[in-house]
Amino acid sequence: MGAPLLSPGWGAGAAGRRWWMLLAPLLPALLLVRPAGALVEGLYCGTRDCYEVLGVSRSAGKAEIARAYRQLARRYHPDRYRPQPGDEGPGRTPQSAEEAFLLVATAYETLKDEETRKDYDYMLDHPEEYYSHYYHYYSRRLAPKVDVRVVILVSVCAISVFQFFSWWNSYNKAISYLATVPKYRIQATEIAKQQGLLKKAKEKGKNKKSKEEIRDEEENIIKNIIKSKIDIKGGYQKPQICDLLLFQIILAPFHLCSYIVWYCRWIYNFNIKGKEYGEEERLYIIRKSMKMSKSQFDSLEDHQKETFLKRELWIKENYEVYKQEQEEELKKKLANDPRWKRYRRWMKNEGPGRLTFVDD
């Protein structure tokens, strides 16, 4: 018996190499084999042309397509279908009429949308881009139907509403707390007496309201006076509409432009012209050195800010000295704190529990 013409390794020597050199360029083409026709089963109207299904040309407008769809839908609707004499097209039986109706509906859904129709026309003109047509078809079908912009807008509005009520709740808690502080409560009570508000509340409630109701009304009067006389700053300040997320996004371009203008003025006035810092600029530098937010810095007492200005903490060297003093003062407080002493004693004698894997 003679030896085979080619061994499993594509032949030996020069013959095998020649076969490999001839087949290698053809491998990509073999991997990309695709149907030659433009109409593909499973895409749009399948192997039927959507334009032919509706009986319209490719240049037909939306009105003509809609009119053709209504005529065919009435004709092939399963509930209204009646076979016509000599009807040789699809839909000669109720079952085939239902299939024809679904095909007509698919053709109309494909051609009524401009983007889908554009993809379909491109598929008819470029049948060779087989995998690209699959991608565009299923990417549109699987894309979310809800507009992402609507989802973002609703989410931002929901967060803004939550912010407003949360801040308002914090503000009311701060007012309720200040109403229990003797210093502010006495002052508010004196103002209420001077304005005759407490007397009016008692007269108004006489013979009509219980003592508890009168007490609640007086409490509300005191809280209203505190609201009008005390400017709460920081995290418990009165909520402002412009601080909500929705308005922050709307005003973001304005804030960005304002910051750029402010920064350019700062560079021009203080870095180029060498002007002396004003009180506002000094407090800004101090706040940045302390790494505090604007709301945190605004919540500080006025006498603290005056101390910062007197010690000229906007100068880096002075701030470093002040920072060192604060650290030393904190160490002294901790050294004299009984709880801190107990903690250090416990750490020295017992220390934290240890895990060990040594057998006893």
Curated annotation (Swiss-Prot):
Gene Ontology BP terms: protein folding
UniProt main location, coarse: membrane
Pfam families named in the record: DnaJ
Gene3D superfamilies in alphabetical order: DnaJ domain (1.10.287.110)
Domain J span(s) in chain numbering: 49-124
Transmembrane segments: 20-40, 150-170, 244-264
Topology in the lipid bilayer: Multi-pass membrane protein
Localization in the cell: Membrane
Recorded GO CC terms: endoplasmic reticulum membrane
Keywords per UniProt: Chaperone, Membrane, Transmembrane, Transmembrane helix
Family: Belongs to the DNAJC25 family.
Protein name (Swiss-Prot/TrEMBL): DnaJ homolog subfamily C member 25
Organism placement in taxonomy: Eukaryota, Metazoa, Chordata, Craniata, Vertebrata
